[in-house]
Amino acid sequence: MPYAEAARALLRESVLDALGDLLRQRDWSAVTMSDVSRRAGVSRQTLYNEFGSRQGLAQGYALRLAHRLVDAVGDAIYAHVGDIHGALHSGFADFFAESAADPMVISLLTGEAKPELMRIVTVDSALIVVPASARLTESFMNSWVAASREDASILARSIVRLAISYVSMPPESDHDVALDMARLLSPFVETNALADKA
C-alpha cells in the first residue's frame, strides 16, 4: 500500500475511533465535528476534507461497521472449512454481538429519533452495501467456497443487506437470528456453489 494511501487509512481509522469514543460518552445528537477533531487530534478542516460533513462522518463509521461484518463472515469461512452453515452462523453471530455493543448503533436505537442515522441504513444504504458486498463477493470466490462471481455476488449482497437491516431493528433476544440466517442462506451455497464441485 502506498504511503499516502496508508496515511489516509490511518487518519480515517483514528477519526472513526475518536467518534466511537465520544459516542460512548454521549448521544450522536450531542457530538459535533469540533468534538471529533479535538478527540482525533486533527483540524476541523482535515475532518471536513476527509468526510465532507457530519453525515459523511456517520456514513464512514457505518461503512466501517459493514466491513466488520465482511471480516466476521470472511474469518468464519476460513475457521469452518467445508461447513458453510457453521461459517455463516458464526459470522452472523459475531457481527450481531459486535453491532449490539457498537456505540453508534446504541445511539441510533436510543434517545430521540435520529433520521440522519436511519437514512444511512435504509434509503442511503447503497453507500454501505455496495462496497461491503464487493469485498464479501471476493471472499466467497477466493476461499474454499469457490463460488462463481454471480453466485458469490448474490450471496454477498443478501448477507450484507440482511445484516444491515438488523442494525436498525436488532435481532430478538429470545431467538437465534444468526442460526436462522445460516439456515436460510446455506442451501443456496450448497445448491449452487458447492454442488458444482461435487
What are these regions (language model features)?
Residues 1-10, 186, 193-198:
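N-terminal intrinsically disordered/low-complexity leader segments
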Residues 1-39, 56-59:
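Basic, helix-initiating cap at the start of DNA-binding domains
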Residues 32, 104-110, 117-120, 175-176, ...:
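Short, hydrophobic secondary-structure boundary micro-motifs
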Residues 40-51:
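Short hydrophobic/aromatic patch on the recognition helix
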Residues 60, 74-102, 156:
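Hydrophobic alpha-helical connector segments
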Residues 70, 103-107, 116-146, 150-157:
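Amphipathic alpha-helical packing segments from all-alpha helical-bundle domains
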